Structures are given as C-alpha cells and as structure tokens.
C-alpha cells in the first residue's frame, strides 16, 4: 500500500505535504523549493515542463505556456498545442504529477493516495473536474476538502484550548474564501462559508500590468498590450513588484529592451510604483472581500467579538492592505502570525489524509455545502431540499406528485442557488423519470433524494414509489459557477427577496385553490347521493367560481373564491355527518356511541384531506 499525501492545488502555486511519524511535513520539490509554480509549458522539442522550469521560459514561449488554469476548472475551456486539445483537467494533472514525483523521490516510496483541496466556493462541476485531474495524474483521490477547512484543521489541532471559533480569510492567487469554523475536542465543524471564485492575487498583478502599460503608452506612444512577449515580462515584473511592496514603500520596475519604436530603436521601461498608488489602483478589489466576510458572519449567527482566532491563508494575505482590512473587519483583532499562509492548507490536507487512512485518531471534519440545492416544482418554484451551509455528507428526501391526470413521466430539474424562483438560479442538470403508472394527478408518489458526498459532489435520485422505477443523475456536467453568476445569486437573493416571496405565495395560493376545487369535485362525485340537490348545486357553483378566478391575475379574488368553496364544503360535510348520525340512531346507544365517534373522526379526517 502506497503513501498518502495532502495537496494544495493552487492557482499560482501548489504545495504537497505528508505525515511523517504522525507530524505533517511539507515536501520540497526537485528544485529545493517548498512551493511549486502551477505553470505548465510545452517546449518546442516536445518536452513538457512543469513548475519553476516552465515559469522560467515563459517569456520566450508565451503561446505554449499555461498558468492559472485553476480559473478554468469545471468549464469547457481547452487549449490547442501542436494540434492537440488539452482540457483544464489535463493541465492540472501535469502539476499534480510533478508533486507526486517529488513526494516519491523524498519518501523513497510510491504515492498512491491524495487529499486535494479546493476553494470552499467551488461548484459541483469544479470539484468533479479537480477529482478527475487527480485521477489523470494517477492518484486515488481520497477526498476533496475545502481550503479554509484544511487550514483550520492544521491550525486548530495545535491548540490546547477546548472550544474555539476560528475565522479563516483565504486570499490565494485566483480565488477568495472566508469561512467560520468551530474547533473543540478533535471536531472541526464549519459553521458558514462564502467566497469569490474570480478574485485573487492575479487580479492585483493585472492592475499593476495595466498601470505600467498606461504609463508606457503615455511616455512612448507605444501600446505594449499588443506585444505578447512584452506582456509576459510585465506580468512577471508586476508579481515581483507586488511582493516587494509588501515590505517596502515603493518598488522599481526596470525592463530594458521591452520593445522597439517605429525606427526599430530599443525602448526601455523604468517606473516606480509606490505602495500608496498600488493600494489606490486596487482598492475596489480589496472592497470585494467585504461582502463574503459579512455574509459568513450573518450566516453563522455570530458577532465579530465571538471570534477567538483569525487565520490568514494564501500568499496574497501578505499584502499590508489585506491584513489591515481583516484587522478592521474583526474589530481590531490581530491575525495569527504563527502559520505559513502558503503551506497551511497542504498541511491540513495531509492531516485529513491521515484521518482517512487511520493514521490520525480522534479527529472529525464536518464541512458544508456553499449554496442551496433543490428542484423546480409547479409554477416554477425552487423547492430547496438542502439549504446552504448544511454539513456534508448529507442526504435529504422529499416526496412530490404529478400535476396532471395519467401523467406518464416527470422531468427533474436540479438547481443551485438562493432565489425562490427556480429559473433565477443555476441549472446543474436535469433528467426524466418515466414509466409512471396511469393515475389521477396527486396520486403517484415520486420520492426525490439529494445525496451530497464528502467531496461536495451531488447525486440526485427520483423514484416512483408505486412502480419502484428509479433514475439517478450524478451532477458533473455544466460549466460551473462564474463569478458573475455567484454575485447575481447572492445580490439578487437579497434585492429580490420580497418580490420572490410574493411570487411564491401567489403561486402557492393558485396551487392550493386548484387542488381544493379538484378534490371537492372528486368528493362530491363519490358522495353525491348523500346530499341534497341544493347543496350539490352550491358546491359545484363555488368550485366553478374558483376555476373562473384562477383564469385571472387577482390573487384576492382567488382567496375569496376559495373561502366560499371552503364554507360550502363544510356545509356539505355537516349534512353528510347529520344524515349518517340519524341513520345510526336506531341502534343500541351504548354499542353505537363509540363506533359513531370512530366513524365520524375517520370520515371527518378523510373529508378534510379532500378539501
């Protein structure tokens, strides 16, 4: 049996860790560094370069060098190299394969298993794609774990305190997450999580690149954005300047021979970027971290003062403006300086690998699903089966029925999001359950089950209880959730909460009215001989009035018609009850009384159920 490792598969850098004697150890790569750039290059001689070697030749091999592929995970993105198309999974797998090789060289043993981390706000498609990348790399993926959760696991197990509330602020190269967790007695439980899958250090780098391009254009009249090689040099310089500005008040960017002018004379770029200017041009990026932070505090139902520790994760948290913002948001609390933001996630992943392999005892990791899951029901309503921030793995079932008589099949449409109307959420997938036995509407019992495994991957099953027929879908298609979609889900859910609630209530009123008219007519057909023609006429007219009201848009008119039908139905029930009581009066009172009561209760219940 081979060894198990923990891998932080990052946007810009990746890290691998292993348990040695029960203690997590970060493994240095073949170049001697504890972090490996998530860069893959295809050299013109056919060699595939990964990590620092790929990054080093990027300027001279721009079109055949791929970086930040994590931002394309879970989409249909591909890149063509030498007439062969590569998916994001294949490119990610190259990085994983290098980490696997370097770990095997360090351990002197085969590495077969891995726990791989993903941003907490990764969608189902993105998690599935990450797992596939691991499989392509020849790894048995034991578990997909959320990055902030892994960080809290690594941080929390070193603490001697019994109960503690930890806030993890994770700003990496391409993604942002914030999670609130409770740790105590070996249990790591996520209370709430939120994030932004399109926000990370790359965006800060790009702002510096844009600033340099504009400065050069103003000074020299040349637009560097049209020169691929120059842009690659600018990206590398921007990253270095950003890192330098974390410890200095200014950074100089000097790039000789960046391009040539119209007369083929070489041009030089030489600019100095101050920390103040850097913070000014990136302020809006920093502001985008506030909404997920506030959302997590709200969802977890805690106050800032209840947070015991703040843990910063991801190299981008080294920027002074970021750590100052976190301090401000948490009421002046100093973030913990005792963890390495680049390595803590991989360390947590190695610990979780140890838990799953039985090497680490008495540790339980309870993660959550970041967005609600449900299906579309009559009227376009989003019926949620699993609410956001539900602990996973989890399984929830609910029984639905048909909307029409003799309906032969049902279409199950699975959505992810927070809006009350299904169409406003993200469609994850759909499937059909056929072979439903002919029956009046409302009779078939269709049980829909949502099952989210510990990796956060969704399985949905629909089963006809009458025939036993079943159909299952594993949600792995679709393009995942873009930043715009996630922003829309959260912001729209807040902005349109009242509108959604009103529409949902209106649809429920319509559904209830339609059902009541149908059930009342059915009851009248079965019991018509027990009531007078006058009562039958009144009930029928009241049911017809409901049908007429349903044709319009006036919800109050529908409610009035339903109240009238309810009144007439009660009169009908009362008449049937009195008739049966009179018929039973000839029997012996002692023997009859209990039976009459039983019969009345059953009949009354049945009657109510049919209204």
Curated annotation (Swiss-Prot):
Organism: Corynebacterium diphtheriae (strain ATCC 700971 / NCTC 13129 / Biotype gravis)
Residue ranges, compositional bias (Basic and acidic residues): 492-511
Region (Disordered): 492-515
Phosphothreonine modification, residue list: 175
HAMAP family membership: DnaK (MF_00332)
Function: Acts as a chaperone.
Name the UniProt record assigns to this protein: Chaperone protein DnaK
Source species, domain of life: Bacteria
Gene Ontology MF terms in the entry: ATP binding; ATP-dependent protein folding chaperone; unfolded protein binding
């Amino acid at each position: 049996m081979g060894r198990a490792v923990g891998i932080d598969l990052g946007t810009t850098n990746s890290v691998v860790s292993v348990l040695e004697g029960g203690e997590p150890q970060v493994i240095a790569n073949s170049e001697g560094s504890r972090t490996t750039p998530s860069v893959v290059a295809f050299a013109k001689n056919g060699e595939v370069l990964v990590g620092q070697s790929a990054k080093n030749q990027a300027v001279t091999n721009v079109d055949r060098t791929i970086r930040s592929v994590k931002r394309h995970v879970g989409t249909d993105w591909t890149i063509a190299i030498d007439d062969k198309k590569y998916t994001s999974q294949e490119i990610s797998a190259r990085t994983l394969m290098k980490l696997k090789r370097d770990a095997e060289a360090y351990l002197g043993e085969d590495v077969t298993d891995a726990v791989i981390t993903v941003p907490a706000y990764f969608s189902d498609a993105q998690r599935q794609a990450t797992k596939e990348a691991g499989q392509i790399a020849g790894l048995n993926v034991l578990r997909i774990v959320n990055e902030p959760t892994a960080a809290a696991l690594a941080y929390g197990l070193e603490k001697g305190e019994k109960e503690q509330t930890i806030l993890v602020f994770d700003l990496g190269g391409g993604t942002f997450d914030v999670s609130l967790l409770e740790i105590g007695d070996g249990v790591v439980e996520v209370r709430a999580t939120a994030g932004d899958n399109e926000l990370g250090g790359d965006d800060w780098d790009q702002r510096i690149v844009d600033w340099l391009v504009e400065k050069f254009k103003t000074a020299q009249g040349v637009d560097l954005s049209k020169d691929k090689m120059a842009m690659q040099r600018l990206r590398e310089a921007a990253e270095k300047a950003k890192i330098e500005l974390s410890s200095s008040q200014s950074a100089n960017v000097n790039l000789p021979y960046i391009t040539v002018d119209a007369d083929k004379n070489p041009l030089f770029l030489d600019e100095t970027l101050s920390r103040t200017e850097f913070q000014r041009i990136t302020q809006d990026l920093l502001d985008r971290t506030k909404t997920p932070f506030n959302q997590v505090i709200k969802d977890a139902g805690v106050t800032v003062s209840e947070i015991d520790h703040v843990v910063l994760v991801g190299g981008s948290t080294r920027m002074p403006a970021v750590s100052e913002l976190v301090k401000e948001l948490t009421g002046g609390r100093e973030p913990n300086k005792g963890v390495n933001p680049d390595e803590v996630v991989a360390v947590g992943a190695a610990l979780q690998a140890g838990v799953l392999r039985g090497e680490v005892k008495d540790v339980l990791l309870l993660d959550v699903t970041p967005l609600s899951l449900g299906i579309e029901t009559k009227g376009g309503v989003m019926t949620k089966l699993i609410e956001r921030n539900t602990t996973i793995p989890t399984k929830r079932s609910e029984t639905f029925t048909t909307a029409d008589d003799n309906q032969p099949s049902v279409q199950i449409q699975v959505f992810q999001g927070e809006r009350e109307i299904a169409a406003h959420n993200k469609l994850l997938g759909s499937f059909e359950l056929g072979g439903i036995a002919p029956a009046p509407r409302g009779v078939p019992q269709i049980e829909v089950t949502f099952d989210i495994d510990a990796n956060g991957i969704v399985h949905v099953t629909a089963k006809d209880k009458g025939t036993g027929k079943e159909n299952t879908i594993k949600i792995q298609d679709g393009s995942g959730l873009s930043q715009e979609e996630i922003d829309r889900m959260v912001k729209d859910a807040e902005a349109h909460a009242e509108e959604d609630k009103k529409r949902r209530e209106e649809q429920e009123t319509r559904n209830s009215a339609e059902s009541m008219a149908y059930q009342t007519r059915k009851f009248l057909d079965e019991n018509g001989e027990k009531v007078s023609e006058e009562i039958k006429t009144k009930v029928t007219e009241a049911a017809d009035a409901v049908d007429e009201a349903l044709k319009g848009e006036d919800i109050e008119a529908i409610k009035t018609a339903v109240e009238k039908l309810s009144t007439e139905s009660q009169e009908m029930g009362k008449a049937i009850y009195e008739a049966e009581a009179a018929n039973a009066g000839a029997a012996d009172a002692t023997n009859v009384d209990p039976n009459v009561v039983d019969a009345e209760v059953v009949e009354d219940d049945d009657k109510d159920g049919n209204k």
